[in-house]
Amino acid sequence: IELEGLLEILGYQSTGGCYRHDSRQVIFVGDFIDRGPHQRRVVELVRSMTESGAARAIMGNHEYNVIAYYTPRTNGGYLRERSAKNTGQHQAFLDEYARDAHDWAEAIDWFKTLPLWLDLEGIRIIHACWEKTSVDQILEFQNGSNLLGDELLHASGDPTTWQYKAVDTILKGKEIRLPNDGHF
C-alpha cells in the first residue's frame, strides 16, 4: 500500500509487522478511512505502530463520522444520519470489514481511543483547526482529557450544542460563507 512505501522512503523498516524508525516517531493526523483503497490495512498498520510506541495518532473527521454513524441516539436513530450520501462515504470501509463484524467493532472501538489533538512540547497536532475556545471548552467538559468520550460524543451529535460546534471546528475546520454563493 502507498502508506508503507511512504514510511520506507522516510527510513522506517518493517519488523514483526510494525514499521519502526531508530530515531523518530511518526504522527498520524487522522482520516485513515474513507480515502482510497486498503483502508483495513491502513487501520491495522497505524494501530500496530501506535500500540507499539512507534507512532502517535489523532482522530480525524472520518473516524469521528464513522463512530457517529454506528452510535445509536438515546431517542432512536444514529448520531450520524444513515443517508445514501453518508453510507456512500463509508462504503469502502464497510465493504472491507463486511465479513468480520468482530474486527469492524474492534476498529471502531480503537478509533474511540484516539485523542482529538496532541499538545506536545513545542508542537500542537490537530486534524483541522486549533481554535483555543473549542479546545478549552472540550478540556473543561472532559475534565482535562483530549479524548472524545461517550458524553462528548453524544452531545456533539446534536447540531444545536456547543459540543457539536467545538468538535466540528477542530475536526473539519472553520467554514465561512463566501459572497455570491462562491466556492473554491
Language-model regions: role of each:
Residues I1-L45:
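N-terminal active-site segment of His-dependent metallophosphoesterases
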Residues G36-V43, S48-L178:
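Active-site neighborhood of divalent metal-dependent phosphoester bond hydrolases
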